[in-house]
Amino acid sequence: VWAPFYNEGLINKYEFPFQMIHTETDFFETNIDYDYLIDNPPYSSKEKVIRRCVELNKPFCLLLPIDTLERKYISSLFRDRDFTIIIPKKRWKFINNGDKITMPFKSCFFTIGFKLGRQIIFE
């Protein structure tokens, strides 16, 4: 699993039953071998990140603000693909320097290629 944006975040404190890949390289110019991309990318470049993920043509899951669903590029990029949108029931709290922070917006998972079916899941 490639997590290109996690840097030195909280994810480092967990052990996974699969190999996590992180490189200190530019995501937009790096080509590495991986099976899945799962991450919480910088929201300031979300369109560029989504376009790059689609271009890489491998399964991905991105945690993004729910209002990303309203963007025109989403319908054009997702229209003919096996996508699933997973919407959590509650607004998530993120941990920053040990403090739980409620984000001012709701988030959801945008996925392509996980064979979950073409749907929006309210979870």
Model-derived regions, located:
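Class I S-adenosyl-L-methionine-dependent methyltransferase catalytic core
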Residues: 1-123
